[in-house]
Amino acid sequence: MAACAEKLSPSPGLQLIENARQTGLPTIVEFGATSCTTCRNMKPILEATALELQGRAHVIVIDLNQDYAAAGPFNIRMMPTQIFFAADGREIERHPGGMAQPEIVRQLGFTEDCD
């Protein structure tokens, strides 16, 4: 008798991204890893952005060491890569490498002082 195939659970990162894209808020998703120096340098920038834009945008960080399956559907080739989604869920920008906080805020559709 053949063994039953193990049921694969969906990627938690993909589910998080999908949920955020359905909220009507702009979203940044960074695909990175704790083993990546630039990714580690981005951590405080993304944390500050999340705090500044709390309730107005989603900031999601996917650690590909923990959830590699999340990279596939987005064709991630470099770490870090940031993907920006408009409030309607459409992908509007993709950026490989590090980014400054003012640029992240601008890409999300806000001015630097979040007017």
Question: What name fits each language-model region?
Answer:
Residues 74-83:
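Structural micro-motif
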Residues 1-3:
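C-terminal motif of bacterial Sec signal peptides marking the signal peptidase cleavage site
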Residues 5-7:
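Bacterial signal peptide processing site
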Residues 22-34:
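Short active-site neighborhood of thiol/selenol oxidoreductases, capturing the structured segment around
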Residues 84-115:
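Non-catalytic, surface beta->alpha helical segment in thiol-disulfide oxidoreductase systems
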